[in-house]
Curated annotation (Swiss-Prot):
It comes from Staphylococcus epidermidis (strain ATCC 35984 / DSM 28319 / BCRC 17069 / CCUG 31568 / BM 3577 / RP62A). The active site is at D94, D268. GO terms for cellular component: cytosol. It comes from the Bacteria. Its EC number is 2.4.2.29. Residues 249-255, 273-277 are annotated as: RNA binding. Its cofactor is Zn(2+). This is Queuine tRNA-ribosyltransferase.
Length: 379
């Protein structure tokens, strides 16, 4: 039996969205689920206890960054990532591919792997499917990701076709190199840019390799949201119904709802933590930039409908003061709030699926959030 399995609970009669449970060696979580990103073995400014308090069930670690610092050997010596960072819930690690491909001017792709330069000191490094598997096996995450090529968007058709075929060959090498299938599940990543036939080809090739779960990669990289939704809707039909489906890099509230409707189970994004660090908050009524002068004497919480630690105890005026003064506590408070907001949104999505009313929920949320206008405020 694979290390990670998907249990289907129900399908929303109104929208077709899925309610399920993903079972892992470090516990189970209901889906659809948002996963906070802990790039360097920490969700920035948050303790594991605080993550548990806001009902985070699974978090991400970043293979590329942890390989370079502190090194996978040190984390292996500590007993794996769970022990190293004191998180006893499920962990998903990416393959390192996305980081390497975002260094586009510093890298060279071959069939063997990718040669690139260190993003800070310029030293030469090489990452291959086998190396990515070795690092992730050392990290000991519950869910590992296959090493894929993430083509830019837009890109020429022939380039993307070559790229997805290489990704399939690399995926087969990942399966062969993976040393711990009993306690770590390896997911395949479907690519294909904005070409529907290539998305279909990539999905079918990877499904034939029989991974225990599948991700859609290469979206949410700057393309218009309707293009992303179209690609997700098209690709979903070729993904197994009895395995988890992970949409990589998506974390805006509207996209989480839209892509849950389109059959996705798992999402991750640095968005809530990144915008929190410059004082931008997600609220029931849309985006709130707490640094703005109008909040200087505003004694209301960030969101009057929110019951997170921040909103229970602190005012907009105080948080604005902290952020303006560059006090770390301000960033902690906005991060707690944003992550709580998204995790609560996912809980509301799951409840709406239970009640067969996710499309109604979407309309209500969009109306209040300010997304039904001609040019909605975006993150």
């Amino acid at each position: 039996m694979p290390a990670v399995t998907y249990e289907h609970i129900k399908t929303c009669k109104q929208s077709g969205a899925r309610l399920g449970i993903v079972h892992t060696p470090h516990g189970s979580f209901e889906t659809p689920m948002f996963m906070p990103v802990g790039t360097k073995a920490t969700v920035k400014t948050m303790s594991p206890e605080e993550l548990r308090n806001i009902e985070a069930k699974i978090i991400l670690g970043n293979t590329y960054h942890l390989w370079l610092q502190p090194g996978n050997d040190i984390i292996k010596h500590a007993g794996g990532l769970h022990k190293f960072m004191n998180w006893d819930g499920p962990i998903l690690t990416d393959s390192g591919g996305f980081q390497v491909f975002s260094l586009s001017n510093l890298r060279k792709i071959s069939e063997e792997g990718v040669e690139f330069r260190h993003h800070t000191n310029g030293s030469k490094l090489f990452l291959s499917p086998e190396k990515s598997m070795q690092i992730q096996n050392d990290l000991g995450s519950d869910i590992m990701m296959a090493f894929d090529e993430c083509p830019p968007m837009p890109a020429e058709y022939d380039y993307v076709k070559d790229s997805i075929e290489r990704t399939t060959r690399w995926a087969a090498r990942c399966l062969k190199a993976h040393q711990r299938p009993g306690d770590q599940a390896l997911f395949g990543i479907i690519q294909g840019g904005e070409y529907k036939d290539l998305r279909e080809q990539s999905a079918k090739e990877l499904v034939s390799l029989d991974f225990p779960g599948y991700a859609i990669g290469g979206l949410s990289v700057g393309e218009p949201k309707p293009v992303m939704y179209d690609m997700v809707e098209h690709t979903e039909q070729f993904m197994p119904k009895d395995k988890p489906r992970y949409l990589m890099g998506v974390g805006s509230p509207d996209a989480l709802i839209e892509c849950s409707i389109r059959g996705m189970d798992m999402f991750d994004c640095v968005l809530p933590t990144r915008i929190a660090r410059n004082g931008t908050c997600m609220t029931s009524n849309g985006r709130l930039v707490v640094k703005n002068a109008k909040y200087a004497d505003d004694l209301r919480p960030l969101d009057e409908q929110c019951d997170c630690y921040t909103c229970q105890h602190y005012t907009r005026a105080y948080i604005r003061h902290l952020v303006k003064a560059e006090e770390t506590f301000g960033i902690r408070l906005t991060t707690i709030h944003n992550l709580h907001f998204l995790l609560k949104l996912m809980e509301d999505i799951r409840q709406a699926i239970r009640e067969d009313r996710l499309l109604d929920f979407k309309d209500e949320f969009f109306e209040q959030y300010g997304l039904n206008v001609e040019n909605p405020k975006n993150f």
